[in-house]
């Protein structure tokens, strides 16, 4: 990655945590909002943009829930049709995993094998043995 390029993060899982991360990354503010219902969420005013927007950007999201995908599109977020498509995107530097906990291990392994950096919601894995296996 060139130092003049933005670090591109893609999010798998766009529920409560993933959508909050999407808002923070898309807005450039680094600020998140709590959303009880993802369809009610709105991106913050771009006038709030901080230096964060000069360093990183949201590459896109994917989710198995069509309503969450529709929300992302309505917010101007690129949507990947599958996790595999996201992993194949050479412009993506990192994957932020915000899926149910039992999926973290397999998704992290797949992302690492695809050459991506991994950010994972807590708990990072279901056990320390799983984490050691991933590392």
What is each model feature region?
Residues 94, 100-101, 105-135:
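Beta-strand-loop-alpha-helix segment that lines the small-molecule cofactor/substrate pocket
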Residues 77-85:
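Conserved SAM-binding strand-loop segment of SAM-dependent methyltransferases
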Residues 1-75:
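N-terminal Rossmann-like dinucleotide-binding module
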Residues 37-40, 84-86, 124-126:
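Short, acidic/turn-prone active-site loops that include or flank metal/cofactor-
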Residues 59, 77, 91-93:
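Conserved acidic residues
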């Amino acid at each position: 990655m060139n130092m003049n390029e933005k670090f591109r993060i893609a999010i798998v899982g766009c529920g409560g945590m993933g959508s909050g991360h999407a808002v923070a990354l898309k807005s450039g503010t680094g600020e998140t909002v709590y959303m009880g219902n993802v369809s009610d969420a709105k991106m913050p005013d771009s006038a709030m943009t901080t230096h964060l927007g000069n360093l990183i950007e949201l590459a896109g999201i994917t989710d198995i829930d069509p309503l969450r995908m529709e929300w992302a599109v309505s917010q101007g977020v690129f949507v990947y049709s599958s996790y595999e498509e996201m992993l194949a995107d050479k412009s993506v530097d990192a994957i932020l995993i915000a899926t149910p906990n039992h999926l973290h291990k397999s998704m992290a392994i797949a992302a690492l094998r695809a050459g991506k950096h991994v950010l994972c919601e807590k708990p990072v894995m279901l056990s320390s043995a799983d984490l050691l296996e991933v590392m």
